[in-house]
Amino acid sequence: MKTYRRQIREKILQALYTLELRDTDIDSAAGWLLTPEILADPKAMKFFNLLLGNIKEHMEEIDRYIAAHTFNWDMSRIAIIDKNILRMAMAELLYCDDIPPKVSINEAIEIAKKFSSTDKSSKFVNGILDAIFNALKEEGKINKNGRGLIDHTPPRAAKTDAKS
């Protein structure tokens, strides 16, 4: 069975973009974007509903995290595509326990490269998500268990000068 997660992320991004520009609800905006292959795949639909549901339910909280880490940027000044990529990745980081944080961040970067109008968008998305992820990790708000879900690499020891 094929995995459609990237395609689903792209469809959700398109739905969020539509929502910003048109007077419609998010379910309608997302519904007409789904392909027959996604609709026929129960695992794909489960992921779609989980991710979209978490974005809808937690958008205010997600936006607060983004706003807190976009210094000197008002949320209204962030490009619509970039803002919605950040929202989607944040929903994955916070509420999709089976997706490693690095995967969520990498997917956001790749989608930014594909959909954003400037080359700097992927760097912007990467920087913001990295800062938010590090803050969430420090606060103990990333609750992912299982192999590969959290990087347990110990921090490097500070280099000492051997000439003392």
Curated annotation (Swiss-Prot):
GO terms for molecular function: RNA binding. Residues 144-164 are annotated as: Disordered. Keywords: RNA-binding, Transcription, Transcription antitermination, Transcription regulation. It comes from the Bacteria. Involved in transcription antitermination. Required for transcription of ribosomal RNA (rRNA) genes. Binds specifically to the boxA antiterminator sequence of the ribosomal RNA (rrn) operons. Belongs to the NusB family. This is Transcription antitermination protein NusB. It comes from Chlorobium phaeovibrioides (strain DSM 265 / 1930).
